[in-house]
């Protein structure tokens, strides 16, 4: 790997990592006021769209000056840049949530867990009511299904409560964010491999 390529990989990885790091900062500043739909639209939808555009641009940038840009080289470029960026994001998360604002992290995510259970409850009961109204369930089947849903919700609520009590008592583990890094890199590797198939030079096979 030439020095110019190494430097460009590092610069692009740092730039993408800084972009990633904006999101936990936005969560800290505005997360409490966001609805779940806005949160997932911004932190998953917008994030993934911008990441995709950026990483494809980087791939094309390297393709323009690389004498060989087969699948292996294409994937290597995309994954190295992504791995650097996600590593920077992980450092930001650990610094922000473990060191400076652990209480805020717990508050934000505990509320989100409760909201998710509430949404699941509304959807499940609405689906059950519609099935009963349409005549797909008799009275006994409806009551049995409703009891199962309520039992599942009760178990979910108690599990979530226990989870956050444990975190409050023991603190936020750094392994949580390290685990997220490994999880993200696994799926990003698959996504990068798909992109590399399109970005590589078609007449080069590796």
Task: Tell me the role of every PLM-derived stretch.
Residues 27, 31, 59-63, 88-97, ...:
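Membrane-water interface at transmembrane helix exits
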Residues 91-139:
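Functional transmembrane-helix hotspots
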Residues 2, 6, 61-63, 67, ...:
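Juxtamembrane interface at the cytosolic side of transmembrane helices
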Residues 7, 11-15, 76-85, 179:
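Alpha-helical transmembrane segments of multi-pass membrane proteins
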Residues 1-68:
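Transmembrane alpha-helical insertion/packing segments
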Residues 145-186:
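Individual transmembrane alpha-helix segments
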Residues 19-27, 50-51, 85-89, 93, ...:
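Alpha-helical transmembrane segments of multipass membrane proteins
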Residues 62-98:
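Hydrophobic secretory-pathway targeting helix
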